[in-house]
Amino acid sequence: GPNYSISDLFNYTYNTNPITFPATFPALEGDTHIRFGNAYLSSSRLYTNPLAYMSSSFRETNYNTLNVSMSLEQKLDFITEGLKLTALVNFKNWSESLYSRSMTPWYYRVSDDGWSANAPEKFFIEQIGPNGSDYISQSDLTRSTDQTFYLDTRLDYSRTIDEHSLSAMLMYMQREFRSNILPNRNQGFSGRLTYDYLNKYLAEFNFGYNGTERLAKGNRFEFFPAVSAGWVVSGEDFWEPMNDYIDFLKIRSSYGLVGSDETGLAAGAAHFLYQNEVAMNSGYGFTTGAAGEYGLWGPNVTRLAVEDAHWERVKKFNVGLDIRMFEQLNLAVEFFHDRRDRILMQRASFPAIMGYVDSTPWSNIGKVDNKGIEVSLNWSKQLFNDFTLAATGNFTYTANKFVYKDEPDYPYSWQMDTGKPLNRMTGYIAEGLFKDQAEIDAWPDMSSFGNAIMPGDIKYRDIDGDGRITQEDMVMLSPYGNIPRIQYGFGLNMVYKKFDVGLFFNGSAQRNIMINNIVPFNADDFNGEQNLMKWIAEDYWSTSNPKPNAVFPRLGITQAQTSSNTVGSSFWMRNANFLRFKTFELGYRFPYCRIYLNGDNLAVWSPFKLWDPELWHNSYPLSRTFNIGAQFTF
């Protein structure tokens, strides 16, 4: 398979100027290699030829997985009816072996004196850059393995006596994952007790008593209980007059605790939180001798043990409603509120003067709220003998915020994360583009960005009023970020005689994206010289196009010349809501066969027009596909 990133290949292809050099030059008699085209980006640096990048290496990977499970089940009715013992043991061994083969491409260009404008079809080429290789080289074989051992033993009890139903479960679990020698271990107990009376009154209690090796003794195990209850209102006698309209109505709610022992890992916390980590020869030491000619490295504490570390915890509350109307319409509505606390994070409020060089302490102090509502709907009805119509829909709204986050002592409240959404848009408030030098001279100082401010650059609002544009002037531009708060979908299915039609739409709302880090701003990421997007080339600020509302500020030769324009600001924030015509299918049924035509990703509607609003500008685009097929039934 390919030995490269598909996204990188797409970016190189997307950003390489197609007229700078050809992908290849014609082969000559006796050639033992492909003549890839290229050119000098600088005195010694070549461009990236996407075809050469794709063709220069590949890899072969072999995976082996051994998965063995054994379970035993024993009914214990001789003790009490409905009691059962189950034991499960699972062992999985996974291994990977990988090697790659590669060659160094040969690059060529048209020589400076090797062509004539009068006869452009005739030219001479010359080799550039380091010599390539005519033969493929092979890497060493790389092997990786891991093993997982899992054990659980459980007692189940289920029994119905008259109008009472009772079930219970008690389980012990142990898991060990071993990779790179050091194992990961978890163990714990869990249980569940469920009761219902007349299928109308429902109650459940469950718990987990879980342990992790990441924490110190005394804190490794924690108890996580949860309770839930439900009431089938439509089962009551007083509801009978309503059964013709609402034949099922259930109210349900739950509250409980859930724990996670992976807290802090994504942010860089140590695996064993209760241990100090010390590095030798890490750049800290002392010198001695009359002339300071002797130096010795000393130990450096790179991670401090987390005192009294605990499990991260989520307090989850849900309340829901399930309704069925006219035996046709099913509606489920659920509200949820999660309070996540004990989030492990570094103490940003501790100043460096306290002596924490590489070992800023961690603490279980973060708190985050997440709440929202979920709605799902299904409806189906046979309108007349030959025609049936069905509809489905779903809607989700979620919002979150930092309840508490340890932060530095900021001078202004708008710099704080606490009390604000996690996924918000932050940046400078843009006030348009500078029209001339006189306006620049009268504007608050913008030298902190490092480039010479010129007409056509973006001007920013001085929020703190100190006469300078600095990071203290960055504010929350929108509570909505690139993760939508609202996601929804709806569809229809129709059957008429032997024809059937189905379609589905999905979309998102309350979503913004920031497009400041796009070409040509990110030129250094790939080739250093890239194409301009059409919308930029058609409407950027210039002396010949001094529009105060141009869609793009002035251009520069290098990124450093326009660094003030690349920062996040309201100038670059865009509404990325969208509605997508996701799928469509038309079918016709014969006695033993159904033929169909379907399509995927048929259309998208959005106020954002530059590219697919669900993707980023350099992402591989979603394909629009059509299929014709047949399904046979015998």
Regions found by a protein language model. Give the residues of each.
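Glycine-rich, charged/polar anion/phosphate-binding loops
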Residues: 303-305, 474-479, 485-490
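Glycine-rich, aromatic-lined ligand/substrate-binding cores of catalytic
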Residues: 81, 481-514
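Extracytoplasmic gating/loop element in the C-terminal half of outer-membrane beta-barrel translocons
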Residues: 51, 115, 451, 455, ...
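Extracellular/periplasmic, surface-exposed regions of secreted and cell-surface proteins
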Residues: 1-102, 110-423, 427, 568-634
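Short helix/loop capping segments that flank catalytic or ligand/cofactor-binding pockets
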Residues: 95-98, 262-263, 438, 502-504, ...
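Conserved small-residue
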Residues: 267, 382-482, 522, 533, ...
